[in-house]
């Protein structure tokens, strides 16, 4: 009973053992007559439904707006992406992507179980239609101790626990392939969605000896070496300084001594121990020369980058000066425009004053002409009166003279 349960239990070890026995073991059969030796063509397994291809239209990160089920696959429309509308006989689905994937996984699992049960029924019917006796080879006889080992699976072990034992079946390559297909179908497991990778977090770690800070990715890598005795960690350069010229490592925190230390990464750890020490003050120079040749960017590129950066700084400074000059010119132009407006206002005021003075001058000129005309008239009248007075005076004097004589 325990062997039957182990054979039917879907554990990885049992599946591997079953497949190895099915591939490696060869069963020989003796048909009773030639008529029964003629084989019928083995039934073909039902064709599997080809999975529909899912096409994403637009940005996959955008919300799902519509889903079109077409003969060549399913088109998921995301966001505001444009998609030609399907024909009238096409199905338009508005579904949730996660729920649709879960439903598809359940349908695939149900179809796999149905195929498995159908193949088992077909195998049982074939066994029932052609009852023959099994002839085991000597090394696999039922009475052999090896055949009773828990690693050997008998034909009755392949049946479900509640079914009757099936009759032995005839030998053929088709039967073995059918049995192997049944075992492979039973070994298939539903595909589960893979978990997303853990986010990488940069963490700053301090060395207590040199007080240097290193930035490592948490749970991914480490620049520190750990003692196997005390689990106190130091940076790699401090570890090299401590073990230089020594066969053991002495922790500077708890003074424990150990021969090996550990360096960790995401895959595990590496045991480190001192093999040999060579004192050579020129070795570090040669090492840095190799680094300069192979592990550093080209000096010409760095020089070009520096020159371009300096030129960029000069251009930025020139641009700033040009902007300043433009701003100053704009200020001067605005000031000159204001002065021009003031001068134009003063000119307009002076023009108005000149017009007023011109009018006053014209008025005064007219008055002057009138006064001059009056003066001329008075002068003429005075001259006439003077001549008349002179003539009268002359006449009076003559009369006076005549009167005196």
Curated annotation (Swiss-Prot):
GO terms for molecular function: DNA binding; transferase activity; zinc ion binding. GO terms for cellular component: host cell nucleus. It catalyses: S-ubiquitinyl-[E2 ubiquitin-conjugating enzyme]-L-cysteine + [acceptor protein]-L-lysine = [E2 ubiquitin-conjugating enzyme]-L-cysteine + N(6)-ubiquitinyl-[acceptor protein]-L-lysine. InterPro entries: Znf_RING, Znf_RING_CS. Residues 14-26 have a biased composition (Basic residues). Residues 1-60, 125-153 are annotated as: Disordered. Homooligomer. RING-finger E3 ubiquitin ligase that plays an important regulatory role during the initial stages of infection. Migrates to specific nuclear foci early in infection supposely to prepare the sites for viral replication by targeting and ubiquitinating host proteins. This is E3 ubiquitin-protein ligase IE2. It comes from Orgyia pseudotsugata multicapsid polyhedrosis virus. The lineage of its organism: Viruses, Viruses incertae sedis, Naldaviricetes, Lefavirales, Baculoviridae.
């Amino acid at each position: 009973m325990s062997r039957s349960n182990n054979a039917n239990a879907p554990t990885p070890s049992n599946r591997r053992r079953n497949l190895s026995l099915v591939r490696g073991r060869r069963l020989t059969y003796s048909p009773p007559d030639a008529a029964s030796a003629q084989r019928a063509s083995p039934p073909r397994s039902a064709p599997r439904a080809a999975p529909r291809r899912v096409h994403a239209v637009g940005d996959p990160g955008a919300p799902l707006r519509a889903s079109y089920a077409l003969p060549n696959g399913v088109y998921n429309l995301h966001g505001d992406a444009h998609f030609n509308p399907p024909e009238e006989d096409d199905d338009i689905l508005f579904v949730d992507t996660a729920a649709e994937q879960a439903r598809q996984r359940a349908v695939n699992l149900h179809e796999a179980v149905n195929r498995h049960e159908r193949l088992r029924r077909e195998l049982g019917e074939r066994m029932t239609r052609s009852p023959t006796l099994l002839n085991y080879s000597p090394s696999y006889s039922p009475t052999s101790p090896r055949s009773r080992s828990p690693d050997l699976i008998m034909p009755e072990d392949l049946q479900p626990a509640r079914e009757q034992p099936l009759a032995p079946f005839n030998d053929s390559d088709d039967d073995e392939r059918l049995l192997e297909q049944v075992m492979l179908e039973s070994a298939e497991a539903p595909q589960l969605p893979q978990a997303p990778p853990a986010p990488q977090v940069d963490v700053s770690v301090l060395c207590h000896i040199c007080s240097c800070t290193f930035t490592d990715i948490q749970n991914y890598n480490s620049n520190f070496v750990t003692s196997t005795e005390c689990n106190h960690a130091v940076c790699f350069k401090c570890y090299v300084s401590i073990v230089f010229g020594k066969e053991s490592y002495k922790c500077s925190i708890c003074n424990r001594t150990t021969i090996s230390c550990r360096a960790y990464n995401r895959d595990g750890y590496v045991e480190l121990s001192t093999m040999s020490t060579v004192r050579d003050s020129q070795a570090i120079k040669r090492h840095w020369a190799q680094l300069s040749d192979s592990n550093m960017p080209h000096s010409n590129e760095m020089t070009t980058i520096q020159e371009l950066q300096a030129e960029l700084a000069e251009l930025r400074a020139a641009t700033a000066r040009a902007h300043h000059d433009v701003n100053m010119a704009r200020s001067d132009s605005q000031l000159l425009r204001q002065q021009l407006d003031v001068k134009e206002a003063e000119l307009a005021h002076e023009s108005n004053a000149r017009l007023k003075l011109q009018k006053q001058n014209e008025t005064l000129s007219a008055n002057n002409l009138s006064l001059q005309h009056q003066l001329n008239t008075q002068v003429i009248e005075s001259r006439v009166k003077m001549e008349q007075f002179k003539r009268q005076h002359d006449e009076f004097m003559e009369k006076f003279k005549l009167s005196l004589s």
